[in-house]
Swiss-Prot record:
Top-rank taxon, per record: Bacteria
Species annotation: Achromobacter xylosoxidans (strain A8)
Sequence similarity: Belongs to the ribose 1,5-bisphosphokinase family.
Role: Catalyzes the phosphorylation of ribose 1,5-bisphosphate to 5-phospho-D-ribosyl alpha-1-diphosphate (PRPP).
Protein name: Ribose 1,5-bisphosphate phosphokinase PhnN
Reactions catalysed, as given in the entry: alpha-D-ribose 1,5-bisphosphate + ATP = 5-phospho-alpha-D-ribose 1-diphosphate + ADP
Annotated InterPro entries: GK/Ca_channel_bsu, P-loop_NTPase, PhnN
UniProt keyword Amino-acid biosynthesis present: no
Class in the EC hierarchy, top level: transferase
Gene: phnN
Pathway annotation from the record: Metabolic intermediate biosynthesis; 5-phospho-alpha-D-ribose 1-diphosphate biosynthesis; 5-phospho-alpha-D-ribose 1-diphosphate from D-ribose 5-phosphate (route II): step 3/3
Alphabetic keyword roster: ATP-binding, Nucleotide-binding, Transferase
EC id: 2.7.4.23
GO molecular function: ATP binding; ribose 1,5-bisphosphate phosphokinase activity
GO biological process, one term: 5-phosphoribose 1-diphosphate biosynthetic process
């Protein structure tokens, strides 16, 4: 028997955090800990730049992204740092199959996600500002000016919709600890 998804996205986990907070590392570690029969899925992000080795995303050209957006292929989409990001509508099918689904979202677009999935659980990955600066510098993707902008943005508050459940997971220690916490949250969604 396949459970039907609550239309409100009750098994959706909206992961967010500053650039460099370690979201991609946590998702990679979480995937490695999943049991073969465990219905927890991590959605791919579609992005208009090369995702590199550290990010699990599918690269699209601006034109391809625009075509997919026009066809309604994205459940969620947003622009940030001059790039386009999207989460495919396949997550709706996964939710309807009874899976807990984790998406790598954006703090600035939590309201959009909550509007479509009002029962989602938002999870913010937090990290010490000094450690965040070191991580951003170490990955070599941003200029010094871009790093400064991202550090400033990391400390800015973001709007959290009323009645949106927001959890915070610290990624200051070993990332395996934070990944285990995130996996516990996903497993809790399956049990609810």
């Amino acid at each position: 028997m396949t459970p039907s998804v609550p239309a409100d996205g009750a098994r959706l986990i909206y992961l967010m955090g500053a650039s460099g907070s370690g979201k991609d590392t946590l998702l990679r570690l979480l995937r490695a800990e999943l049991r073969g029969d465990e219905p927890v899925l991590v959605a791919h992000r579609y992005i208009t730049r090369d995702s590199g080795d550290t990010e699990d995303a599918l690269r699209l050209t601006e034109d391809e992204f625009g075509r997919r957006a026009a066809l309604g292929c994205f459940a969620l989409r947003w622009a940030s740092h001059g790039l386009q990001y999207g989460i495919g509508i396949e997550i709706d099918a996964w939710l309807s199959c009874g899976a807990a689904v984790i998406i790598n979202g954006s703090r600035a677009h939590l309201e959009q996600a909550h509007s479509r999935y009002p029962a989602l659980t938002a999870v913010e990955v937090t990290v010490d500002p000094g450690q965040l600066a070191r991580r951003l510098a170490g990955r070599g993707r941003e200029s010094a000016e871009q790093i400064a902008q991202r550090l400033a943005r990391a400390t800015q508050p973001f709007p959290v919709p009323l009645q949106c459940q927001l959890l915070r997971v610290s990624n200051d220690a070993a990332p395996e600890t934070a990944a285990a916490t995130l996996l516990d949250i996903a497993r809790g969604k399956l049990a609810a």
